[in-house]
Amino acid sequence: MLRLYPGPMVTEAEGKGGPEMASLSSSVVPVSFISTLRESVLDPGVGGEGASDKQRSKLSLSHSMIPAAKIHTELCLPAFFSPAGTQRRFQQPQHHLTLSIIHTAAR
């Protein structure tokens, strides 16, 4: 519910949603944070049910470096974008995100 939202959201905004959506995403989530997330989004195995332990460990490691303040900010993002119908597009990353958080919390 927290990890992969900004990456695909900003990517979609730049290509389809127009500059308003892109600037809103960029202003809420730090750019360095987004680039970290994009790597995970581009790897279809990370966080998924078929992911190896090595992939999960890598995901947890990068997640553990994220300050709690940024995580909280990220949780607010879906509320901004759901009226535009973008939430439907990001259900898959959201699912991976939840797995990542559960795995990180278990450590």
From Swiss-Prot:
<dbReference type="GO" id="GO:0001895">
    <property type="term" value="P:retina homeostasis"/>
</dbReference>
<keyword id="KW-0913">Age-related macular degeneration</keyword>
<protein>
    <recommendedName>
        <fullName>Age-related maculopathy susceptibility protein 2</fullName>
    </recommendedName>
</protein>
<keyword id="KW-0963">Cytoplasm</keyword>
<feature type="region of interest" description="Disordered">
    <location>
        <begin position="1"/>
        <end position="21"/>
    </location>
</feature>
<dbReference type="GO" id="GO:0001917">
    <property type="term" value="C:photoreceptor inner segment"/>
</dbReference>
<dbReference type="GO" id="GO:0005739">
    <property type="term" value="C:mitochondrion"/>
</dbReference>
